[in-house]
Amino acid sequence: DAWRTRGVWANEKAWFQTPYTTFGQSPDGCSTVMFPKIMGGASANEMLLSGRKLTAQEACGKGLVSQVFWPGTFTQEVMVRIKELASCNPVVLEESKALVRCNMKMELEQANERECEVLKKIWGSAQGMDSMLKYLQRKIDEF
């Protein structure tokens, strides 16, 4: 739900990854709609299909994150921004946020339904279960 909040702040050491295909799952969480809107089709495909890991700086450059802060100053930087938001009229903030979201609601609901149908299909197949079990076994072996 990061893209629906007022701001997305990341620690410099954070990384972002959607390894769906690695464990035999299709994208979910409306990522098939939001990722292309946020970072363009090529970058969205790179993340959703190949599971490419982005650094915090790369995520910021692609619009997935709004600001990146050093670990030592992260809390202080975020608190400054939270105080700024807290000083704003809450009705104005909520109504503005609703205006931004209202046009996307139906599109996101439809995307979520499609993604859930695909997940059911994958999870219900022998190949889908096999992929997930192989992924889990690799993780157990790494542990």
Provide a role label for each language-model segment.
Residues D1-V91:
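Crotonase-fold acyl-CoA enzyme core
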Residues G51-Q57, G72, Q76, V80-F143:
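C-terminal alpha-helix plus adjacent terminal tail
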